[in-house]
Amino acid sequence: MLEIKNLTGGYVHVPVLKDVSFSVESGQLVGLIGLNGAGKSTTINEIIGLLTPYSGEIKIDGLTLREDATSYRKKIGYIPETPSLYEELTLREHIETVAMAYGIEQSIAFERVEPLLKMFRLDQKLDWFPVHFSKGMKQKVMIICAFVVDPSLFIVDEPFLGLDPLAISDLIQLLEVEKKKGKSILMSTHVLDSAEKMCDSFVILHKGQVRTKGNLQQLREAFGMPDASLNDIYLALTREEEL
């Protein structure tokens, strides 16, 4: 479970988030939605520990980064928007490196990812280097590496970029399975049609603050738009930005 309470933070001398509070329950997929510059990436960077909050608290399963940084980080499986691979390491070596970093036995790591390697059709490419991978293949490697960890919280940032329709379908299926296992999932995306179908709840960020949160019906009530889709609500945010 992810709990964020009264989070204010951002970059040095540049506050971005202002008193942000929301939670992601176990077995829940929450969509983090907002215009560009709303604070989505900053929120993610605060959660994974790349930024230090000015004030407020972030807990995963009741644990803060300050209390035990190693245990806290082991609870997170992060799939970034932009794939970041080591050009000198093969796919196999990437998996081995992640396992080593998290203190996971190599045999267990490969047992965990074997179904994903087959699903993403990378099982015959374990000795390939990133230079031979397309952007979509690199994104699949990032997904596989996140699943090595077997975390309690998945943070998925714009997961559909670069993926073909089959891989998108596979990823949606994977996240659904993890939900059923009781994992918490926070997903930032602009693919609103998919988010509307996948997510149990939403957090709408606007200008660094939580504009509203809840399921689609609760968002409709907050915006006074009884029949709105998630895309309609996003467009309403755009109009608010222009005021």
Predicted regions and their residues:
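Conserved ABC ATPase "signature" region
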Residues: E96, M100, S107-K125
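Conserved ABC ATPase signature
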Residues: F129-G136
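Catalytic Walker B motif of ABC-type/P-loop ATPase nucleotide-binding domains
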Residues: F154-E158
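ABC ATPase "signature
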Residues: K213-G214
